[in-house]
Amino acid sequence: MIARTWHGTVRAEEAAAYLSYLNGTGVVDLQATEGNRGVYVLRRVDGERAEFLMISLWRDLEDIRAFAGEDVERARYYPEDEAFLFELVPRVTHYEVLVRPEIQDGVGERGGGDDAE
């Protein structure tokens, strides 16, 4: 499996609007592409900026190519991205997935599980 990472930064006051836009564009397109194994969208607010990190999981490079085009390292943007983002970062990064989590409901969550106090 391959992880494709992209990052971008917006004004903190526009973070919710950008997330909604991202969910309606990039996330939907990623999920609709054959070979996509999942998408994570992470956000970190730091003062007046909100940083987004998107991690998409893929079966192989051919599946990524179906989404991204021949140059799989080139970031893919949508029409309104320029209005939100401080910078259109031109490249994405790919990683080979070596270990993946087995997520269990309530385990390791604060306030979750039987051992919560």
Model region roles, listed by residue range:
Residues 12, 60, 96-99:
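Non-catalytic surface loops within mature trypsin-like serine protease
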Residues 9-22:
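Short, surface-exposed ligand-recognition loops at beta-strand->loop->(often short) alpha-helix junctions
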Residues 21-36, 57-93:
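An amphipathic, aromatic/His-enriched active-site/gating alpha helix that lines ligand/cofactor pockets
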Residues 5, 17, 53:
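Amphipathic alpha-helical recognition patches that constitute DNA-binding helices
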Residues 27-53:
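Short, glycine- and small/hydrophobic-rich beta-strand elements in well-ordered beta-sheets
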Residues 40-50, 76-117:
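Glycine-rich beta-strand-turn "strand-cap" elements at beta-sheet edges
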Residues 2-8:
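Active-site-flanking beta-strand signature of metal-NTP-handling nucleotidyl enzymes
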Residues 9, 42, 55-57:
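Short hydrophobic/aromatic beta-strand micro-patches
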